[in-house]
Amino acid sequence: MFYQDPFDVIIIGGGHAGTEAAMAAARMGQQTLLLTHNIDTLGQMSCNPAIGGIGKGHLVKEVDALGGLMAKAIDQAGIQFRILNASKGPAVRATRAQADRVLYRQAVRTALENQPNLMIFQQAVEDLIVENDRVVGAVTQMGLKFRAKAVVLTVGTFLDGKIHIGLDNYSGGRAGDPPSIPLSRRLRELPLRVSRLKTGTPPRIDARTIDFSVLAQQHGDNPMPVFSFMGNASQHPQQVPCYITHTNEKTHDVIRNNLDRSPMYAGVIEGIGPRYCPSIEDKVMRFADRNQHQIFLEPEGLTSNEIYPNGISTSLPFDVQMQIVRSMQGMENAKIVRPGYAIEYDFFDPRDLKPTLESKFIHGLFFAGQINGTTGYEEAAAQGLLAGLNAARLSADKEGWAPARSQAYLGVLVDDLCTLGTKEPYRMFTSRAEYRLMLREDNADLRLTEMGRELGLVDDERWARFNEKLENIERERQRLKSTWVTPSAESADEVNAHLTTPLSREASGEDLLRRPEMTYAQLTSLAAFAPALEDEQAAEQVEIQVKYEGYIARQQDEIEKQLRNENTLLPATLDYRQVSGLSNEVIAKLNDHKPASIGQASRISGVTPVAISILLVWLKKQGMLRRSA
């Protein structure tokens, strides 16, 4: 039977991608249905209890700048906040927070249940309704059919998921949850390229069986960082430390002596695992010269005794996991409460997607999260928001939107996936972005909130706060530009006390702030340049914009040159065999990838600058050279 009401957008899956997709579509005013196999696991942290990190924190800030949920949720659930790379430049600084799993899940569910235009329904999805290469709905486990103009797949590791512990394996979407086998079979019937990937998780330890007295503590930062541009530190719950232990030669011997019982090394697992989050087996074998690896013991929550040992993800048998855990300092008597495991699952080639994350072959079908070959909550959330907003736009007969590489880490993520694809779980790093000085955590709102408002993602409260911040930045910069001090002025001695070389000529507040030894806080503590802005976010922007002005201007010039290629569009139906002068290899790659622009084509491996020149000349001759606005 069909459900009585049609929807504009259906989201399948309630993880980090699905929840952001559902919130985005509903915020834009479209009638949205979120289908999940279990309402109680909405926003579940399946692996590590943390949000953010290098590259990942940037994505969280961008999701927040577009009105998303993740940053707000972690501000309410974070039990330890830190700025990583704090001593480095602003481009690579990143926020990371340990999370209380229960509080995080509660924050997500509360937001979902209070979002207008959003209905949540508990049923596993087993089929899609596809008519004439267009998705028009979904069918649940009990045969209930829902109609919609767009469907977003955010199914994580559930598609034909297989859990491995030692040489034993069984079907599962994650520990304690069933896999989605009928939906996996249905998707394999569609004209989509599918492969297998693998990820893993460590055993969880009972905190009461760990001797923390012999371990080093790691505390959060003070003052506490905040993730959301709308948040404040008073929202954070009680803060707790993490602890550090290490593997040792005994640990490594246990692992080496049991590799024949590892499903990875025994050839039982076919899927490729994450390069940047390897299992402890992989670390010991790949870095054989190292006699220890640092392991962070991270609390899973304020009301839980479970500890997440970050760094020993494993699929070795349970008895070997016990030996590994008990070989480390402080864990000699530790007890495991949940075994570690590896999981294999289906993923679909993201090169078959448009930059909007809509399928090139099934109209109205969007993919987001691990189904696209990524790993990590943050990567999933960012894709979910993009897929959700574009599903909403499609359902309203509007054109899709995707950020450029020069505009957001989300743009880098989507361009990498759709242009290059991936053969292993893709993780975001700042090193993947060529314009990272422009794509900082601190300016995510300046880059994206205006666009979020145009798209209908940003509410009135956030928009008012954003404009107030812009005004504060502009007013303060003008004040510093127009406030001067001369070497002979009474205030010069106070200024010189903060400088490595004294004033030799008249200088404005901005001139002084450009000096590497002068901070905004120091400058505004001087009588001549007081008072400081009360808006800390605006003050941070003033300092960064002034200090890095020259570098930022140079990078902006590079972006404008590159935009010419990015804006030169390629017809989706172009058969590159028509273009004389291209090599067979280039023709094959261009026909396979079907890039949307010259810029995208130039990033395909094997497509040379000469090939790009030939293509541009051919397009001009054919009268097909056109650029987007």
UniProtKB/Swiss-Prot annotation:
NAD(+) binds at residues 273-287. The keyword Ion transport does not apply. It is found in: Cytoplasm. Keywords: Cytoplasm, FAD, Flavoprotein, NAD, tRNA processing. Gene3D superfamilies: FAD/NAD(P)-binding domain, GidA associated domain, C-terminal subdomain, tRNA uridine 5-carboxymethylaminomethyl modification enzyme MnmG/GidA. GO terms for cellular component: cytosol. One of its GO terms (biological process) is tRNA methylation. Its main location: cytoplasm. Its cofactor is FAD. FAD binds at G13, G14, G15, H16, A17, G18, V125, S180, Q370. GO terms for molecular function: flavin adenine dinucleotide binding. NCBIfam families: mnmG_gidA. Belongs to the MnmG family. This is tRNA uridine 5-carboxymethylaminomethyl modification enzyme MnmG. It comes from Salmonella choleraesuis (strain SC-B67).
